[in-house]
Amino acid sequence: MSSKEIVSNRKALRNYEVLDTVDAGVVLTGTEIKSLRDHGGNLGDAYVTISKGEAWLLNASIAPYRFGNIYNHEERRKRKLLLHRYEIQKLESKVSQKGITIIPLGMFLSRGYVKIRLGCCRGKKAHDKRQTIIAREKQREVESAMKRYR
């Protein structure tokens, strides 16, 4: 079961603390699939809402397919996510907590189908971001010291 990442949301990892992840399928049209295979997607401002027992991806931008004709897709349309009922209920219970939201972390191909990795996230404050940077720099120093003294 190989999976190939085609779109990632690096902004989400910087601005949010990821608490839990889940993979979901996405209902797409043919030109959207072709555009995503050509790396024509952006998840920068995207988020997920749950309404009437269904999960929807909003604000995700998939560029129009360059070889498409008049039947090309809309760039920022609402896209339905394919999840089991218990997964939707689990996400809904987490989102009901204060400060938790569902953010798409990336899209990947799995067995020819486009899947999306969703994360239950909490927003980071400025001091949290600084602490993350400091921890990453310390880890880098430790790794370089270990490499030097091998």
Curated annotation (Swiss-Prot):
InterPro entries: SmpB, SsrA-bd_prot, SsrA-bd_prot_CS. PROSITE patterns: SSRP. It is found in: Cytoplasm. Pfam families: SmpB (PF01668). Keywords: Cytoplasm, RNA-binding. PANTHER family: SSRA-BINDING PROTEIN, TMRNA-BINDING COMPONENT OF TRANS-TRANSLATION TAGGING COMPLEX. Belongs to the SmpB family. Required for rescue of stalled ribosomes mediated by trans-translation. Binds to transfer-messenger RNA (tmRNA), required for stable association of tmRNA with ribosomes. tmRNA and SmpB together mimic tRNA shape, replacing the anticodon stem-loop with SmpB. tmRNA is encoded by the ssrA gene; the 2 termini fold to resemble tRNA(Ala) and it encodes a 'tag peptide', a short internal open reading frame. During trans-translation Ala-aminoacylated tmRNA acts like a tRNA, entering the A-site of stalled ribosomes, displacing the stalled mRNA. This is SsrA-binding protein. It comes from Chlamydia felis (strain Fe/C-56). The lineage of its organism: Bacteria, Pseudomonadati, Chlamydiota, Chlamydiia, Chlamydiales.
